[in-house]
Amino acid sequence: MKNSIPIDLIYEILSRLPAKSVARCRCVSKRWRSILRHQVFTELFLTRSNARPRLLIGVQQDGEWSFLSTPQPQNRHESSSLVVAAADFHTKFSSGKSRHQCTYASGGSYSYLGFDPIDKEFKVLFMDTCDFIASKDEDHYILTLGTGELKWRKIQCPFTHEPFWERICINGVLYYSAYYSDSNGRSHLIACFDVRSEKFNFIATKHRYDQLINYKGKLCGINLEYARHVGGFPVKLSMWVLEDVEKPEWSKHVYSLWTESEVVKVNRNLSVSGMTATGDIVLSMEDATNPFYVFNFNPDRNTLQVQSVEIQGLGANRDHIACHAFVDYVEDFSVSDAVLQLKSSPLQQQGQDTSHDLSKSVKNKQLDNYEFLANKLNHSVSLAILFCLFFLLFNYLIRLCWVR
């Protein structure tokens, strides 16, 4: 009888690998590709990824984006930590393709992404402005993603306002900062757009916030104030939490952020990335300083953790390199597979024969590439499996000794 590893154990072992390693393993053979694209494996991998969310950092340089991810701090007793990160993947907008956008000569446009948790749909809200004012007399547009048809629909907004970029979507409602002008003058407000019903509302506020975040399921506005001396600390963090949407009723909280390290300095260049599932408010640098600092502040404990991230591959000259951080990043292969299927679906739906686009030489070259990858990866994959098996066996022995 042929000895083989149970498929459940294979799923268990490979789900512990990084996403990049899993993607490479898919190139080994058709059998491996079938295993690693199976629904059982993708769901198991997503479960493990949700248990270990990461911080995603996007680096923008010369029209090219690089994305890297680092672990989010787990040990709350550590006041500081150091991690080294290299780019997981790159993307570049080709210089041969130009983007044309028709807007008013003296205005601009704003677009926001929202999610409807009931129908599980993503929608894009697009607004053209004149002198940066979104008029109630002008059409706004909605694009529903994932339907297989990219078609904009017109909708109306009941009030004229001046939108800004601070935005967040919470429980199917898209919030963004704005100004509202009437006979009494100019006032601050939060525009509320229900993603499912596609209806607008607004909430009057006394401030414009540096950033909007999801604070335990509630809308929260945050402002930062820096110390005037060199170093920037302490940093005053003010929070306004929307406790009741109907009234509306806000609660204010003020904290003083400081670090004992004299090396860590900020120069009015912090951005609020969001709030993690564990309750930490994450602040990060807006530019690619060396080192790149990430701050994790827990309002309940009033503690601040400093994470120093060494970003590799940027070179010595880091001027004009922007950074954007996103919290609770998880890797999901089911989304990646859906994107690949969506990319290939238009030609298939039109019934076009794409076989003529590839010559026999290209096909042979692809086969050679697969064979090369298979030969190159077989060794590393085998080592990865052996390592995972050893790790599982070691944990089993430790537990066995502990029980005895």
Curated annotation (Swiss-Prot):
SMART domains: FBOX. The gene is FBX12. It is found in: Membrane. The chain crosses the membrane at residues 383-403. Residues 1-44 form the F-box domain. Gene3D superfamilies: 1.20.1280.50. PROSITE patterns: FBOX (PS50181). It comes from the Eukaryota. InterPro entries: F-box-assoc_dom_typ3, F-box-assoc_interact_dom, F-box-like_dom_sf, F-box_dom. It comes from Arabidopsis thaliana. Pfam families: F-box (PF00646), FBA_3 (PF08268). This is F-box only protein 12. One of its GO terms (cellular component) is membrane. Keywords: Membrane, Transmembrane, Transmembrane helix. Disulfide bonds: none annotated. It is a single-pass membrane protein.
